[in-house]
Amino acid sequence: MAKAKTKNENKETLEQTLWKAADKLRKNMDAAEYKHVVLGLIFLKYISDAFKDLHQKLVKGEGEYEGADPEDINEYRAENVFYVPPQARWEYLQGRAKLPTNGKDIDDAMDAIEKDNPSLKGVLPKQYARPNLDKQSLGGLIDLLLGA
C-alpha cells in the first residue's frame, strides 16, 4: 500500500520545483528578473486551477450550481474566483509550451485575464515575449509547473 505524502514532503516537492524553475531561467537573466517570470507563471497556474475546479462544478450543474452557465463570468465572480478565458487556461498554454510563440501566448493570456478581471488591470507581468527570454527554457518551465 502506498504511503500518503506528509505536509513536509509536499513542501519539499514544491521547494524543489521552484528551485528547478529558477535554474532553468538563471542562465538567461539575473535573479531580480527571473523571479517575476516564475511568480507570474505560478499565479497563472493557480488561478487556472481554481477556475478549472469551479468550471467542473458548473458543468456538472448539481446542487447550488444547477442551471449555472460555466462560461458566465458572473458565476466566477460570485465565488471569488478569477474568470480565465479559454486562450489563457493552463491546458491551452501547456499545449503550446514547445512553440516558439509561447512567450507571446503567455503575454496574450495575461492581457485576456486583465480584460475579464478589472481588479487585475495593469498588475500582471507581460514580459514573456521579450527576446532575451529563452523560449525553450520557458516551455520547460511551463512543463515543470504542470506537476506543481
Regions found by a protein language model. Give the residues of each.
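Non-catalytic, mostly N-terminal accessory regions of nucleic-acid modification and defense proteins
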Residues: 1-148
